[in-house]
Amino acid sequence: MFTSNGSCGPATALDNLSKRVGQDRTLENDHVARFRDQNSSQNRAFRAESSFNTTAGAEFGQFQNTSVQRNYFPSAELIRKNTRFGDNWSSEFRQQQENNKWVEDFGAMNLENVRMEQEQSFQTMDQRTNMQAMSSTANAWTQEFNHMQHNKEMEYEMRIRETQRLVNAPAREVFSMVNQHSQQHNQNFTHNQTQLGDQSHYMTNLAFERQFETVQNEIDGMDMFSDSEQVEQQKELQKEDDNNDIETTKFAEIAQQVFNQMNNVDTTVSQNTEHKFKQSNFLRLMDKVAQREVEINGSGDRFIDKTGNDIRDYLPDPLSDLR
């Protein structure tokens, strides 16, 4: 009753096992056998190549070496050129590269730690050097202070010994020491006074020489100035004389032209007029000016002869007939 298939009661574990073992697996077995036969035929076709292909072997070796050098990851250029990898593989490759960035970050962090450790070591060395320098300076100062203190103590002890010796010495020795000290002081004072006197005498002579040199320079400057003034005055006088000589020469040339013109009277002039021209005092004056016997004075207001006298004193009075 419990083992029949049509029973409505609950099935036992043994019934379930019997049902599962007793199922028809013919279709599944056929599919497995067909897949096994197909794989065996493909394997036989692949293994049928008995000879070694050198080209394929070289390419395989090159691919293997390249893969080892590149950590088994193809380059981006190879991914772009060869489309058989597909977008899925490229995305997986990029994801894997991003996942591998932690290696670079870890390396950079290690380098930063190394650099910081080096800087800390350098700072520690600098601090040690500074501490050593400060320590050496402090030691030198301490030694110098101890040396000064020792010298002061020695000087103090010498003074105490000298005082004790004076106190314990007889009066004669004390007087002798005081007298000797006084004589030495007088000698030093005399020597200093002599040096001061010599120095004062030297300074006096030096000041006198400087003052004398200053006065001499002033006198020489005045002499040079007076000489230069005389030279300038002589130049001015010479220049004035040259100008006067030029003017006198020009005036004499003009007077000569007038004298010649009055002597060569035109034929249209009457003899009476010609006689008056030749006998006139003006023609005689022009003749004397042309011969440089009469000149114009420096102020240009009168005629003078060679002696410097005014020629009007020698001319006849034109109004004598009317007086």
Curated annotation (Swiss-Prot):
Its main location: cytoplasm. It is found in: Cytoplasm, Cytosol; Peroxisome matrix. Monoubiquitinated at Cys-8 by PEX2 during PEX20 passage through the PEX2-PEX10-PEX12 retrotranslocation channel: monoubiquitination acts as a signal for PEX20 extraction and is required for proper export from peroxisomes and recycling. When PEX5 recycling is compromised, polyubiquitinated at Lys-19 by PEX10 during its passage through the retrotranslocation channel, leading to its degradation. Disruption phenotype: Cells are unable to grow on solid media with oleate as a carbon source. A motif (WxxxF/Y motif 2) lies at residues 102-105. It comes from the Eukaryota. One of its GO terms (cellular component) is peroxisomal matrix. The keyword Repeat applies. A motif (WxxxF/Y motif 3) lies at residues 141-145. Coreceptor required for the peroxisomal import of proteins containing a C-terminal PTS2-type peroxisomal targeting signal, such as 3-oxoacyl-CoA thiolase. Acts via its interaction with PEX7, promoting association between PEX7 bound to cargo proteins and the PEX13-PEX14 docking complex. PEX20 along with PEX7 and PTS2-containing cargo proteins are tranlocated into peroxisomes by passing through the PEX13-PEX14 docking complex. The WxxxF/Y motifs mediate interaction with PEX14, promoting association with the PEX13-PEX14 docking complex. This is Peroxisome biogenesis protein 20. The lineage of its organism: Eukaryota, Fungi, Dikarya, Ascomycota, Saccharomycotina.
